[in-house]
Amino acid sequence: MSSPLDHLKTQLQRAMVAAYGETLSGADPLLVNASHPKFGDYQSNAPLPLAKQLNQPPRTIASTIVDHLEVGEAWEPPTIAGPGFINFTLKTSYLASQLELRLTDPRLGISAVKLPLRVVVDFSSPNIAKEMHVGHLRSTIIGDCLARILEFLGHEVLRLNHVGDWGTQFGMLITYLREVCPEALTAPDAVDLGDLVAFYRQAKQRFDSDPDFQAIARQEVVRLQSGEPDSLHAWQLLCAQSRREFEKIYNLLDIKLTERGESFYNPLLPQVIQALDQTGLLVEDQGAKCVFLEGYTNKAGDPQPLIVQKSDGGYIYATTDLAALRYRIEQDQADWIIYVTDAGQSTHFAQVFQVAQRAGWIPNRIRLVHVPFGLVQGEDGKKLKTRSGDTVRLQDLLDEAIDRARNDLVSRLEAEGRQETPEFIDHVAQVVGIGAVKYADLSQNRTSNYVFSYDKMLSLQGNTAPYLIYAYVRVQGISRKGQIDLEQLTEQPTLSLQEEEEKLLARHLLQLEDVLAQVTEDLLPNRLCQYLFELSQKFNQFYDRCPILQAEEPLRNSRLGLAQLTARTLKLGLSLLGIQVLERM
């Protein structure tokens, strides 16, 4: 369905050109949500920045634009407020008619895009032979959320897991395991991932301190790269062991990924060097092959190179990322490539993108985006660690969230005198615990660090997953109490929006499409979280102040329709965040 906001934006742009000529063609009408409900639903701030350009007072500009504006049947006549804001209010009759259409639409009025794009979302990307830790949490959750939203809007999304499954560390680990635990290289499940991580640390210490061991490990890398059967088999076993552990976490988080690790691109690395050489970008510096970057200098002020092949012939991360980028453009035919990693890699990706751009690999149609995020911090404001100072294992973090959610639920059941089955308790604990962790992350602006707090994220009060899930549960409670299937109301409600709480809820229900469009533009999932939080607040105000089951017909059916739309919107919105809902909790 056409968004009333899109229509208004188009009409405003036409009015600005009609009032002041083609100089304002393409000018942004600066439409935003009204600062307060008393000012209406939206306001245009455009007259204020135009005052200097047009040499007129903002209120005069606002009045002139309004004189040329045809808002259409959806809107009340616009008003001018303050220094020159233009305020717009949707007609109550229009609100009701639009919501009635959404009652029978499984997509809640949100159209799929007319021109779907092929989108690659690169996220999660743990390292083989290492456990997933809290540092992988944000990439995994943010990347999955963006992929879900893009898929829902009709784009063709390839979710890629660029795992670290190649490099010197495997020569080091295989060499060490041959000495201390050879069965790990010949039999599956001979050691668990925790043991493998410990062996990896020991191998690294040996590699750093023992030149003879280091030389053997480097020879092992050569054997692996040349495809020696025993080395290749050992590597495959290590990868399979890690993969099984990763899958446990992905299943718990309900994450779907296509694994395409660094090893996939290994055969393509010589082609990257050759292609860069053919473009004239490649420079040899102290035996290494590199590309000197524009806009980057070292401390001495000299141009900074991006090394793509070391003097010993080895490759680095940048080479692999260039090969991956080229493959995604040429073979995957991607229109849009999104990399979801921590902010510390921003410079790396800016440099990789620059080299690919200068090499002529990126057609104009391609949109390349790095989606950076901040750190997960402990209550002390420092990087989240265990009490012993180790990195927090992601499995431990998720297990504790579920355990705490279970304890909270059991305490509440005891206080209420309720009896529930162990299966019910386990299911609710998992949905609430996992949902709380996801929502606590996604509700923050991803560019900021955030403090990880189980107490805050599991609270039934405030901007949390339990609060939103409980709002959904309240609607299901209406259904049970009234013995009504809200999904199958006996007659199509004619919505009657009389009370202010009904109107505020109705207006908010119509905004989801605009919110998803904004998230698609700036890739900030917290916008969707804020929308759902405000929806829950508005529903709770409506629920507390407007009788539903006790109301007389046709008002009763109208309010049941509003409750049904709220539940469906919450369920859809939470599913786009990767969070399940509950019928009871």
Curated annotation (Swiss-Prot):
Swiss-Prot/TrEMBL GO biological process terms: arginyl-tRNA aminoacylation
PANTHER family listed in its UniProt record: ARGININE--TRNA LIGASE, CYTOPLASMIC, ARGINYL-TRNA SYNTHETASE
NCBIfam families: argS
Alphabetically ordered keywords of this record: Aminoacyl-tRNA synthetase, ATP-binding, Cytoplasm, Ligase, Nucleotide-binding, Protein biosynthesis
Short sequence motif named 'HIGH' region, residue ranges: 126-136
UniProt-annotated location(s): Cytoplasm
EC number assigned by the record: 6.1.1.19
Main subcellular localisation: cytoplasm
Family classification: Belongs to the class-I aminoacyl-tRNA synthetase family.
Single GO cellular component term: cytoplasm
A Pfam family: tRNA-synt_1d
Gene3D superfamilies, per database record: Arginyl tRNA synthetase N-terminal domain, HUPs, Isoleucyl-tRNA Synthetase, Domain 1
Reactions mediated catalytically: tRNA(Arg) + L-arginine + ATP = L-arginyl-tRNA(Arg) + AMP + diphosphate
Protein name in UniProt: Arginine--tRNA ligase
Record keyword Endoplasmic reticulum present: no
InterPro entries the UniProt entry points to: aa-tRNA-synth_I_CS (IPR001412), Arg-tRNA-ligase (IPR001278), Arg-tRNA-synth_N (IPR005148), Arg-tRNA-synth_N_sf (IPR036695), ArgRS_core (IPR035684), DALR_anticod-bd (IPR008909), Rossmann-like_a/b/a_fold (IPR014729), tRNAsynth_Ia_anticodon-bd (IPR009080)
GO molecular function terms attached to this record: arginine-tRNA ligase activity; ATP binding
The protein's assembly and partners: Monomer.
